[in-house]
Amino acid sequence: MEFLKTELPKYGKIYKKEVLDENTNKVVEFYKESPFPNYKSDDDKSTILEKGNKNYLTHEFKKFAGFKKNILEVGCGTGQFSIYFAIGTNNNIVGLDPTIYSLDLAASFAEKNNINNVEFINADIFDDVLKDEFFDFL
C-alpha cells in the first residue's frame, strides 16, 4: 500500500510485521487475554456509529477531518475508532497496533460490515514501517 515504506505481507485487511520487542510482547500477551474494547455480538455499523457519535472528541474529530483524508490511529486495539472514522466517509483509515488478536477482531468486523476504507498494520509503534508525511491526521 502507498502508506508503507516497505512491502509487508498482508493477510486480509492486516499488514503484518513481526513484533520483536520484549516489552511490547508483554503488552500483546495482556491484550490477547482481554481485547479492549471488545465487540458485542450484536454490534454492527449502526452501533459503532452510535457509540462514536456519543463520544464528543471522536464525533468532533470526524467532522473536523472532513473527506478524502489519510488518517492513522496508533494503538488502535480492536479498531473501533478507526472503523467509526471510516463509516460514511471516503477517508483512508489505517489502524496500527502490535496485538494481532485485537486486529483480527477489527478486520473481521470491517469485513463482515463491508467497511472497505480501513486497513490495519500489526507492528510495534517503534518499527519504521510508515512513510513520512503521508497521513493528514494521526
Region roles according to the model:
Residues 43-68:
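Conserved alpha-helix/loop element of class I SAM-dependent methyltransferases that forms part
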Residues 92-97:
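Conserved SAM-binding motif I beta-strand of class I
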Residues 129-138:
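A short acidic, Gly/Pro-enriched loop at the edge of an enzyme's catalytic core
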Residues 78-89:
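Conserved SAM-binding loop of SAM-dependent methyltransferases across substrates and taxa
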Residues 114-126:
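Conserved SAM-binding strand-loop segment of SAM-dependent methyltransferases
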Residues 67-77:
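Conserved class I S-adenosyl-L-methionine
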